[in-house]
């Protein structure tokens, strides 16, 4: 109302300067006209004018007056129109203000009704909240009772398990003590004896190993000596072969010189010597092949053979012009060679003796080696037996360790059970803390309810103020905003309720659809039962007919048998009738079976119908 009146005043104040300007212009024209009259009056008095001039002047004055009057009239009409427009605008503004006031009153009424509805809803919500709080407390109390019962049960179980474990630990400790005492009594003397035997065997092994090392060193030395001797013998044999070749050359030279029979005899002796030497070579080669690398030869044989070889080369280098000198020198050289050959034979015999001695020594060494190997094998067997005994002892010790580990595990289980008891106590403490927190929350909820009551009182006072102060639109706007928020909350609640109702309705529809489908199924089952009943009736009728036919056929057969003797064709007819009777009997049995199956199906359908009716 104030705003509309202020706008109307502002418009009138804005239009007032135009009015003042128009009035000012009219007054200025009137002043000018009066001044003209005043200025013209002395002229009329002073100057004589004609009537025509006066008339024209009067006409001009009148026209000017008319124009001024017309101007004043037009200005007044404009002012009147402006005043009318302002009045119309003021009336329309007043009407609009009244309409707005009515709309605001309606809004206030609607807001008051909404506030009352919200108060009712708030009361319902308070009651629902109280019920929820009560249910929460009941659920929490039940939960706490269940927790306490579970904790007590667990504590009892842990106590029983603890007592069982303690008893088991005591039994195991007793067993361990008994086993350890028995094992110590049995094993300690055995261990001491085995340790003594092991130390003695170790000493024997060390001594035998040292002996074996010494024997192996001796054998290696003897083999090295034999190898060197065999090498020297081979070198001597090679030198002898070279000497034979030189002797043959000398024979050829003697034949050329055509000397006497002395040379021939010497040559024969030489051939005998060569045969002996070859025989001795063969004898030397056979033991050299048997034994390679044994005993050392004297260096004197090698030196003599080298001297003979040099002398033979000198003889070959002499010219052929001196046959007599050659013959004498050759005889001397042959004698010398025979002497050397005899020496070589003697040395070969000595070397063969030494080789045989070395062979005997080698055989002795091998026998001793075999004996040592046998002793080693025996010692190894004894060591293996001792190791097996040690393994058995270690197995028993490992069993003892396992028992100790089991005892430790049981102790760990006891420690874990104690830890679990501590954890349960902690959980109890946490549950007590949660109970205290719940109590604090309950107190907070009570405070919130008190605050809600205070807000209700404030709402009542604000409603009274709204009734008293209808002009305070700003407060109404704030209250309208609050009511809008409450309206939105109420609408949300209504939407949630509508959603729940829709869900319930959809569920009801589903249930109705299921019921309809079940009804349809029942109807179909009833139709099936009726059909099966009709079929059973038909089968019964057919069975009765077949029974009648069978009875008639039997009567006819009996009548024929009584009246006439049966010829062959009658017998065939009777056989056919009997076959037909058998077929009819089989059909009758099948009909009875179908009837029984139909009866069972009817019973099952009846039970199913009863179940559907009960459900």
Swiss-Prot record:
GO terms for molecular function: protein-macromolecule adaptor activity. Residues 1-18, 29-38, 322-343 have a biased composition (Basic and acidic residues). GO terms for biological process: regulation of exocyst localization. Keywords: Coiled coil. It is found in: Vesicle. Residues 1-55, 258-289, 319-343 are annotated as: Disordered. GO terms for cellular component: cytoplasmic vesicle. Accumulates in preferentially xylem cells. It comes from the Eukaryota. Residues 19-28, 39-48, 262-288 have a biased composition (Polar residues). Residues 87-121, 148-211, 327-563 form a coiled coil. InterPro entries: FPP_plant. The keyword Transmembrane helix does not apply. Belongs to the FPP family. Ensures, when in complex with COG2 and FPP2/VETH2, the correct secondary cell wall (SCW) deposition pattern by recruiting exocyst components to cortical microtubules in xylem cells during secondary cell wall deposition by recruiting EXO70A1. Interacts with WPP/MAF proteins. Binds to COG2; this interaction promotes the association between cortical microtubules and EXO70A1. This is Filament-like plant protein 3. The gene is FPP3.
